[in-house]
Structures are given as structure tokens and as C-alpha cells.
Amino acid sequence: ALISSRLGLEFKSQLDIVAAALLHDVGGLMIPGNIRRKRKADITEDDEKKISQCYQNSYIAFKDNTDLSPDIKRILSASIAVLHPDIPAASAKMPTVIGAEILKVAYNFDNMTAMKFGDEPLSEIAAVRYLLEHVDEFDKKVVDALLNSINILSPGVCVEFTNGDNGLVVTANDSNVLEPFVLSFKDNKLYNLGDSAVARSMQIKDIMKTMDNRHVVDSDLLKQYTGKTINMG
């Protein structure tokens, strides 16, 4: 909904896209639990066929439902075509549908960053970098709308750099979310990551999950603690 709103689509179109997204995910709920609990690397070719069959069965049921509006069916059909091209019912060449492109970007971003059984989720930074790098696969306008919706590198966010240092986002970059102005904790200097000279030596690797506020405590001193005041010299 946020992506479609950022793209300026009319309200009815936004509702149709949300409805199509929910109907698409019904197919995912039909996937057997033993397959859903597998790590991605352990998914077999037979498992892939069963997964596709679940989405296909769901798609066919909704396609024949006379209560659904033609617009929702069109978005759902196009979404199945771009997300599950191996499904026979969606194999026919279809014109580009903006709703399907939105669902494609949202589905892939959610899939990469969501918690999964046995698999570590990608960070939002890694997911965004993947979407931006695969311009031939994902609509750039839709990816930009996603970035404008989630604000992952807003001022105040602590980040890790590729050179091993940590820092703080000072000013966001509307042109490229991965290239804001940052403050390096190492030398207390400001850096413009949009500057190619700076980018050659440091880029944003990931967002820091938490600031570590733990204190280092001497273990021998800790053993002496009995609830009374200790003279530390």
C-alpha cells in the first residue's frame, strides 16, 4: 500500500493491489509445513514442484471466482506470471502491469529480510542493494518508492562501514539511499558517501543492530562482591 501510494496511484488501485497480494499469499499458506520448515539450500526439485502447485491451485480457484473484480484478477494473474513463471497457467506472455511490478519488489524484499526456518535473513541494506543492482529485473521507479516508504538510513541511524569502522547517518540522500552524509566514530569526521573518491574506501555495509552499552567488569573483582561497597583504590 505504501509503495503504491508513493507512486501516486489512485486509492482504488491501491486497494486492488493489496487484495491481490493477500490472495497471492493464500497459495503460500497451502505449502506443506515440512517444506516450509526446510532451509533454502535443502529445498529439492520435487519440493519446488509442490510449492508451484500450491500457488497454481490457489490462482486457478481465484481466477474462476466471479465475485472478484477484473482488476484484482488482472493484477493477481500478472503477479503469478512474474513471481512464478514456471506455473503453466501463468506462462503466457502478459503486458506489464504496475500492480504486479509492485508486488514483485515487495515480495522479494520481504522474502529476503523475513525470518525463516534455518536461514539467516538478509539485512535491509543487503536486500536494497540487491534490488538496486538488478535493474533489469526490478522496476527502478518501484524500488525507489519502496525506499521512500521504509526510510532505512534516516538521520540518527548507526551503521557499519566496509572498512570496518562504525558511524552515524547525519543527512539522508534522496538521490541514493545508500550514499548519505555520515559521521565516522573513528576520526569524528563527516563523509559524503555520494563522493566517488570517498566511496572507493568506504561504503555502508549494514545497519548496527544495537549500540553496545555493556561495561567490562574484572571477573576477580566481581567474585569479591557481597553486596557491600568495594574499595576500588
Give the label of every model feature segment:
Residues A1-G233:
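Histidine- and acidic-residue-rich, metal-dependent catalytic cores
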